[in-house]
């Protein structure tokens, strides 16, 4: 099966039909200012295809004697993703360990909205750069908020029924029954 290699560059337009003049829609995928931002608009199949491509690319550039020791790239399982997101903190609510979403200065510790429709409160109306917030104890950034990640396995049988006030229908998701980690 052929899988398109490029993300859905109209990912946000599906929900905001009349916002074609919004610079984010036009520039996010192509402008160098967004090089360190997360990839969005990618289906589960596209994420899997990228893993396959990345494995082949790496193996192609390795000497023959090292190829047997290399593992393939793949999506993490939900359990692996959660383990990485927690950063070694077993009982913590957030990857940074504390029960609070703001630091002592009142600044948000992740890219998420505190109230329905309040997208500016964390400093970013859409996504945030990959290193915009403090990393967890494993050195991973944005493991709470920002964008959703695809996983190989599902967390819950109902994980395909995800809704938010940004997108109530998810009609444009090409693989709605695949695991999605929020």
Show which residues each predicted segment covers.
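Functional-site microenvironments in short loops/helix caps that host divalent-cation chemistry
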Residues: 4-170, 174, 178
């Amino acid at each position: 099966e052929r899988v398109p290699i490029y993300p859905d560059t109209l990912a946000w337009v599906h929900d905001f039909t009349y916002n074609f003049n919004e610079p984010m829609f036009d520039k996010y995928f192509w402008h160098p200012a967004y090089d360190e931002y997360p990839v969005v608009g990618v289906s589960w199949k596209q994420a899997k295809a990228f893993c396959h491509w990345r494995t082949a690319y790496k193996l192609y550039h390795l000497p023959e004697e090292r190829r047997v020791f290399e593992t393939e790239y793949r999506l993490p399982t939900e359990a692996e993703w959660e383990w990485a997101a927690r950063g070694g903190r077993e009982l913590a609510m957030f990857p940074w360990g504390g029960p609070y979403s703001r630091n002592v200065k009142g600044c948000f510790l992740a890219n998420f909205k505190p109230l329905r429709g309040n997208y500016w409160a964390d400093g970013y109306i859409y996504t945030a750069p990959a290193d915009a917030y403090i990393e967890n104890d494993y050195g991973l950034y944005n493991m709470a908020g920002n964008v959703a990640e695809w996983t190989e396995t599902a967390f819950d049988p109902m994980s395909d029924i995800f809704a938010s006030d940004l997108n109530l229908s998810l009609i444009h998701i090409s693989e709605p029954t695949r695991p999605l980690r929020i």
